[in-house]
């Protein structure tokens, strides 16, 4: 029995300054474009821009 395709998908957020990644979910209907968030990067030890990758 197949399940219905939901609106929430799992995405990876990759740091623009190092290779660190976060994994999170986003709502496909509310955010159809790629996300860009400022989050803490433990490698460079400061807040940097993270971009959504496939």
From Swiss-Prot:
The keyword Metal-binding does not apply. The keyword Mitochondrion does not apply. GO terms for cellular component: cytosolic large ribosomal subunit. NCBIfam families: PRK00595.1, rpmG_bact. GO terms for biological process: translation. This is Large ribosomal subunit protein bL33. Gene3D superfamilies: Ribosomal protein L33 (2.20.28.120). Pfam families: Ribosomal_L33. It comes from the Bacteria. One of its GO terms (molecular function) is structural constituent of ribosome. Keywords: Ribonucleoprotein, Ribosomal protein. InterPro entries: Ribosomal_bL33, Ribosomal_bL33_CS, Ribosomal_bL33_sf, Ribosomal_zn-bd. Belongs to the bacterial ribosomal protein bL33 family.
């Amino acid at each position: 029995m197949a399940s219905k395709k939901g609106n929430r998908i799992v995405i990876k957020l990759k740091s623009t300054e190092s290779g660190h990644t976060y994994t999170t979910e986003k709502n496909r209907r509310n955010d159809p474009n790629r996300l860009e968030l400022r989050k803490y990067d433990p490698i460079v030890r400061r807040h940097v821009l993270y971009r959504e990758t496939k």
